[in-house]
């Protein structure tokens, strides 16, 4: 008797990754998003490429290196030696959201760069998380003497004053100023892995909508429905996209 082994579809594979919040593989889930455009992509190879970067980074650190030294070494390695930076010339290119492309070109958007940076940071023992900051995804590291917030698009660390300046336009737009001002600490809470993937997908959703790319839009919305089964607006938008697709 011949047994036929079939690989799961990209969507089924994604669904298997995002089932549990307790065991949510952020890097793998983020890497798998590219399979909509690269159906033959070997996600494990992408993870292996990141592991190789991790090994190179660890060779630069003494076992007893202090957290601040680990952070400085990571930033030197990631932003200067490897040359990761924001794609300022083509910010809305979908490739900026695909980790295989970001690893190849060293260009991305804040959230895709953040996913790679966080993976390396956690791999060298840093307490690093993403921040769903309005308009621009950030990363933070908790150190013994305080918290450092970094813009993954530039590698720049940001003070509370600089963060407040970036936040002010969004607060004014929402009427959250003066007596209704929200403490900045509420905007610096760690983003859960599911929320990170949702933000990447919604970035792609916005790009595909703006380009009237209905095929790609439906694929992204299929993932959003799997990721956020209670997000009824995504079901509605998927139905609209199907109608536009014909």
Give the ranges of each region predicted by the language model:
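A structural boundary/capping signal
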Residues: 1-246
């Amino acid at each position: 008797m011949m047994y036929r082994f079939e690989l799961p579809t990209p969507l089924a594979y994604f669904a298997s990754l995002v089932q549990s919040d307790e065991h949510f593989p952020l890097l793998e889930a983020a890497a798998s998003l590219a399979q909509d455009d690269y159906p033959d992509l070997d996600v494990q190879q992408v993870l292996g490429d990141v592991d190789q970067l991790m090994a190179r980074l660890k060779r630069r650190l003494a076992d007893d290196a202090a957290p601040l030294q680990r952070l400085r070494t990571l930033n030197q390695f990631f932003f200067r030696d490897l040359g990761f930076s924001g794609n300022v010339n083509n910010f809305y290119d979908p490739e900026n959201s695909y980790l295989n492309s970001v690893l190849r070109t060293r260009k991305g958007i804040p959230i895709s760069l953040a996913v790679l940076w966080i993976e390396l940071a956690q791999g060298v023992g840093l307490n690093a998380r993403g921040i769903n900051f309005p308009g621009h995804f950030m990363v933070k590291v908790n150190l013994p003497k305080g918290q450092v917030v970094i813009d993954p698009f530039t590698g720049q660390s940001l003070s509370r004053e600089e963060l407040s300046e970036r936040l002010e336009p969004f607060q004014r737009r929402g009427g959250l100023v003066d007596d209704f001002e929200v403490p900045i600490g509420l905007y610096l809470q760690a983003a859960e892995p599911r929320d990170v993937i949702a933000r990447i997908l919604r970035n792609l959703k916005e790009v595909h909508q703006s380009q009237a790319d209905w095929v790609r839009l439906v694929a992204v919305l299929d993932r959003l429905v799997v990721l956020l089964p209670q997000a009824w607006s995504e079901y509605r938008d998927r139905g609209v996209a199907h109608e536009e697709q014909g």
